[in-house]
């Protein structure tokens, strides 16, 4: 077999991995301010309970104003480093496990039928997601804690953590390794729910809407993909809220006993709508990330003749 042509002087898979990382870093860094606002709004009740926030945010705009006023504009990128670093081990693990899980659960839609294919897709996605999460979950935990580490008005403007390493050090000291994995269960459930809804909705709607001239229309496909992504994201958002609220209790005296206990307490004390706090910012983040990535893809095509795709999430 002929040797594959090198890209940027490197083997193709190495170039894809590294340049994909640059794409991910650009996308995540561009959307980081919206991501931090989303996390602050989403987890504000845990911050109030821990005495790290004096009053609730009155929506996304109020959170943005107060955060920039109290901490400065650059604080909007707090926690972004951990989020960017997380891309590389996640992608490496995806390369390692992707083929293995595809062989285990790889049904073909036209041969085995839609439902077998869908079940295999959910099983492989859930298994691959859970396996990757085992290795990178602590980085997502650290990112969440740093992003929600607002300068406490009640505690003289002090932060709880002094950077990424400090999050690990303090969490392990107070809660052990288990503290870094709080909320792991709902995270895996969220992957399965999201994938199930995404593929289920996309496969159901595409043959109905994308017909005739729209069948191979890029904008129509992009719009449908974005709508389905948004719908799946909103539907699985409560699981994201539950896992992050559980993360926020590491190092605190009172913790949720389980994901069910967390959901029950949140709904009982704050109402169902609390499970969707920050969902609006999450949609904006998706738009910002996709927009920047589209522009960056075009630049890569101009410079290198191809676009290198970065990971999401």
Swiss-Prot record:
Protein location: Mitochondrion inner membrane
GO MF annotation, one: ATP:ADP antiporter activity
Single GO biological process annotation from the record: mitochondrial ADP transmembrane transport
Keyword field: Antiport, Membrane, Mitochondrion, Mitochondrion inner membrane, Repeat, Transmembrane, Transmembrane helix, Transport
Annotated spans, Important for transport activity: 243-248
Documented activity regulation: The matrix-open state (m-state) is inhibited by the membrane-permeable bongkrekic acid (BKA). The cytoplasmic-open state (c-state) is inhibited by the membrane-impermeable toxic inhibitor carboxyatractyloside (CATR).
Protein known as: ADP,ATP carrier protein
Organism: Neurospora crassa (strain ATCC 24698 / 74-OR23-1A / CBS 708.71 / DSM 1257 / FGSC 987)
């Amino acid at each position: 077999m002929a040797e594959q042509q090198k890209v940027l002087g490197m083997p193709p898979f190495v170039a894809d991995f590294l340049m994909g990382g640059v794409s991910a870093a650009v996308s995540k860094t561009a959307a980081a301010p919206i991501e931090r606002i989303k996390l602050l709004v989403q987890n504000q009740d845990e911050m109030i309970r821990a005495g790290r926030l004096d009053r609730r945010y009155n929506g996304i705009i109020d959170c943005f104003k107060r955060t920039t006023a109290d901490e400065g504009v650059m604080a909007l990128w707090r926690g972004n480093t951990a989020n960017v670093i997380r891309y590389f081990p996640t992608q490496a693990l995806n390369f390692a496990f992707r083929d293995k899980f595809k062989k285990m659960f790889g049904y073909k839609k036209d041969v085995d039928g839609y439902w077998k294919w869908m079940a295999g897709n959910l099983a492989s996605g859930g298994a691959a997601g859970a396996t990757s999460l085992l290795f990178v979950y602590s980085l997502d935990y650290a990112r969440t804690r740093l992003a929600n580490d607002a300068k406490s008005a009640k505690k003289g403007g002090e932060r709880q953590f002094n950077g990424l390493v400090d999050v690990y050090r303090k969490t392990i000291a107070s809660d052990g390794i288990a503290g870094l994995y709080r909320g792991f269960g709902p995270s895996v459930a969220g992957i399965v729910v999201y994938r199930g809804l995404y593929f289920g909705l996309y496969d159901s709607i595409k043959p109905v809407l994308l017909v005739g001239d729209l069948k191979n229309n890029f904008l129509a496909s992009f719009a449908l993909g974005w709508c389905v992504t948004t719908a799946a994201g909103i539907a699985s958002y409560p699981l994201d809220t539950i896992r992050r609220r559980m993360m926020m209790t590491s190092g605190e005296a009172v913790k949720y006993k389980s994901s069910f206990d967390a959901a029950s307490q949140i709904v009982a004390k704050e109402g169902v709508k609390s499970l969707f706090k920050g969902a609006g910012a999450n949609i904006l983040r998706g738009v910002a990330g996709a927009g920047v990535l589209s522009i960056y893809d075009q630049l890569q095509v101009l410079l290198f003749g191809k676009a290198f795709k970065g990971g999401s999430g």
